[in-house]
Amino acid sequence: MKPTPSDWPRMSSSVFYQDAVAAIQWLCDAFGFEIRLKVEGDKGQIEHSELTYGEGLIMVAQETPQSERAWKRAMRSPKSQNGATTQSIMLFVDDADAHCAHARARGAQIIEEPATHDYGEDYWADRSYGAIDPEGHLWWITQRLRNPPAK
């Protein structure tokens, strides 16, 4: 048996929001994600969703601080934590500048303008920008310009 289902990447992240319905719509509109699955609870809240970007996948859900399950109580939006975040999410795109312009027009807070980062001829070069989504999650949007040479 393969350890990973055929339609899943080996690693994925879960991102929690106070308003997961609005977050999913925003992530699709601003960043270009597509909804693969959305499971709504009896009050319309998002219990689970899967959003794809190319072959990448993230899960988005409603934060539930009153949940009976300890892990669900622990998962919070930065908006619930005075804007504090302890991680970022990296997304590779085809054109970082065009993606930034599109995201900015849809309300992304750009915290670092697109810039080229060249780590030398033995390494890679990227063009990337940093953005904060409406609930405070930090995103690094990156375009690979050059791969490291084959060894």
For each predicted feature, which ranges?
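Short, surface-exposed ligand-recognition loops at beta-strand->loop->(often short) alpha-helix junctions
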Residues: V15-D19
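Vicinal oxygen chelate
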Residues: M1-S14, I24-Q25, F31-I132, I141-K151
